[in-house]
Amino acid sequence: EGKSTLVKAIMGEIDYEGTLQLGHNCLIGYFAQNQAALLDGELTVFQTIDEIAVGDARTRVKDLLGAFMFSGDTIEKKVKVLSGGEKTRLAMIKLLLQPVNLLILDEPTNHLDIKTKDILKDALKAFDGTIILVSHDRDFLDGLADKVFEFGNKRVRGHFEDINGFLKNK
């Protein structure tokens, strides 16, 4: 009830009433629910990442792909033949390579298996910035979120505790 709408407002995708103010020098990276569908199916896995990697990241492309379970012949596969989970992992690598300080993730664990969720969670823990994460996946949020914003009855309530504290006190 309003979570994805908030994300769309922050991203400037919809009109809204009121004021929305982002911090100074805020650089946003956005992972939409359909992010994997936006990949170029004709590129290989390696080409998809290599085309956006700049500077120091260029030397780490294969390591980064390996961290997200792409190795060997897999990196030469065309994106169009990848499974939904593989495409989601690839889209997440693209996002993590962008020079951003605010990540907005709208249901990023859809189509992911447990191992991939763990890899993503570790990558997000290592992110040096702010994360706005829309998710119903309590296990994924455990140990990742330190504030919870509850949407309901046309209101947003902030809870300055982790997901377990929020659920316990609800």
Predicted regions located by residue number:
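ABC ATP-binding cassette signature C-motif
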Residues: 1-170
